[in-house]
Structures are given as C-alpha cells and as structure tokens.
Curated annotation (Swiss-Prot):
Keyword rRNA-binding assigned: yes
Subunit structure comment from the entry: Part of the 30S ribosomal subunit. Forms a loose heterodimer with protein S19. Forms two bridges to the 50S subunit in the 70S ribosome.
Function text: Located at the top of the head of the 30S subunit, it contacts several helices of the 16S rRNA. In the 70S ribosome it contacts the 23S rRNA (bridge B1a) and protein L5 of the 50S subunit (bridge B1b), connecting the 2 subunits; these bridges are implicated in subunit movement. Contacts the tRNAs in the A and P-sites.
Region (Disordered): 99-118
Keywords: Ribonucleoprotein, Ribosomal protein, RNA-binding, rRNA-binding, tRNA-binding
Gene (UniProt): rpsM
An annotated GO cellular component: cytosol
Name this protein carries in UniProt: Small ribosomal subunit protein uS13
InterPro entries in alphabetical order: Rbsml_uS13_C, Ribosomal_uS13, Ribosomal_uS13-like_H2TH, Ribosomal_uS13_bac-type, Ribosomal_uS13_CS
Similarity comment: Belongs to the universal ribosomal protein uS13 family.
Cell wall biogenesis/degradation listed as a keyword: no
GO BP terms: translation
Taxonomic source organism: Xylella fastidiosa (strain Temecula1 / ATCC 700964)
SUPFAM superfamilies: S13-like H2TH domain
One function term, GO molecular function aspect: rRNA binding
Length: 118
C-alpha cells in the first residue's frame, strides 16, 4: 500500500481514484495532482515506482488536506456561531443554513422525528 498524506491508498485502484480517498482531494484536484507529478491517471497504485509516489507526495503536500482542512472547516463554523450571525444560529440549532424549507422535510439536518404528546 502506498501511503500519501497519512492515508493508505488501495493498491488495486487507479491513481486518480485512489487519491480521492484523501480528505480534501476530489476528482478535479486528483487529476491536477497527477498532471503536475507527471503520473498517468490510469496507472494502478501498485504499479507506481517510489519516485512517482514521492512526486505525488510533494504535489499533495501543496494543498490543505486531511486534519488541517477539517480543523479549518470546524474553526470557520465555530467562528460563525461565535459571531451570532444568521448562519451561526442555524448551525447552533441544527437547522438548514441556505434557505431550505423546514416545515416539512429537512429531516437529515434535524434528525429523526420527535413525537409530540397530546
């Protein structure tokens, strides 16, 4: 298994798909990383040489990923909550942020229904 950015990549997958298992790297960014590292995107991870893996590590290291990205996102949400702005209040109340209706639907964000006793 190749280890890049602290994540073990599945050896049977293509490089560009395997890179997507790293938090913060999606389809577009994984292709850009492969192009910048001069690695063919359809190469299997098990077929990569050590020099190619090292080039991928260098390219992936240029981005904010994994724990640092999770921390940044969490801090941004916490900042909104501390500011008492509308989005922060919606986060605090576990409600949708972007104008979706809440009278019906919004079950994913609100959680399972709470029974009302009559």
């Amino acid at each position: 298994m190749a280890r890049i950015a602290g994540v073990n990549l599945a050896i049977q997958k293509h490089v560009w798909i395997g890179l997507q298992s790293i938090y913060g790297i999606g389809r577009t960014r994984s292709r850009k990383v492969c192009d910048a590292a001069n690695v063919a995107i359809y190469t299997k991870i098990r077929d990569l040489s050590e020099s190619e893996i090292e080039r991928l590590r260098v390219e992936v290291g240029k981005y904010v990923i994994e724990g640092d990205l999770r921390r940044e996102v969490g801090m941004a949400i916490k900042r909104l909550m501390d500011l008492n702005c509308y989005r922060g209040l919606r986060h605090r109340r576990c409600l949708p942020l972007r104008g979706q209706r809440t009278r019906t639907n919004a079950r994913t964000r609100k959680g399972p229904r709470k029974a009302i006793k009559k």
